[in-house]
Design a protein with these regions (language model features):
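Conserved alpha/beta-hydrolase catalytic His-Asp/Glu region
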Residues: 127-143
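Structural motif
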Residues: 4, 65-67, 91
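Active-site signature of alpha/beta-hydrolase-fold catalytic machinery across serine-
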Residues: 20, 80-84
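Active-site acidic short loop of glycosyltransferases
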Residues: 2, 27, 62-64, 87
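Active-site loop/oxyanion-hole signature of alpha/beta-hydrolase fold enzymes
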Residues: 32-69, 105, 110-111
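Gly/Ala-rich beta-loop-alpha elbow adjacent to hydrolase catalytic centers
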Residues: 70-74, 78
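Flexible "cap/lid" loop of the alpha/beta hydrolase fold
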Residues: 47, 83, 91-132
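Conserved HGGG/HGGXW glycine-rich cap/lid loop of the alpha/beta-hydrolase fold
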Residues: 2-42
Length: 143
């Protein structure tokens, strides 16, 4: 039986973007949520709002603790989930987690409260303007 691993994607990239990586790990059974924070789970004030999405997935899909791997935003969400429910995790591998100072977190909270975070956060701007349709694979490879 294959070792089970859960993967949490980075902000702005659905989990399927990592399929080439997953294909290189055939010895593992890799589970994931395609788009964290969509559907009935939403970020209202903090990334911690998505912990129930992770824990609900684990409870529905795993009968024992699993290794979890998170990239960027996904790493942070998994850390919050592991903090709240360590019983669900064998361990956690965090790839490139964003670590934000108190000043930055405070500024982000104020901008969210004022409803201007999409206008002033560079990553949010890039994600909102990212194309999802391209003329060819060759075109994408040049980017």
């Amino acid at each position: 039986m294959k070792e089970k691993i859960f993967f949490a994607h980075a902000n702005g990239f659905p989990a399927e973007v990592y399929n080439d990586l997953f294909k290189r790990l055939p010895q593992f059974d890799i589970g994931y949520i395609s788009k964290l924070g969509h559907g009935s789970y939403k970020i209202r004030s903090s990334w911690k709002d998505l912990v129930p999405e992770i824990t609900d997935y684990f409870e529905a899909n795993y009968t024992e603790p699993v290794w979890a791997i998170g990239h960027s935003f996904g790493a942070v969400i998994l850390a919050f989930a592991a903090e709240q429910r360590p019983d669900l995790f064998k361990g956690l591998i965090m790839m490139d987690p964003p670590v934000l100072s108190r000043k930055i977190r405070w500024a982000m909270a104020i901008s969210q409260f004022l409803g201007i975070s999409d206008k002033i956060m560079p990553l949010a701007k890039k994600a909102a303007n990212r194309s999802d349709c391209f003329p060819s694979k060759a075109f994408v490879a040049k980017k």
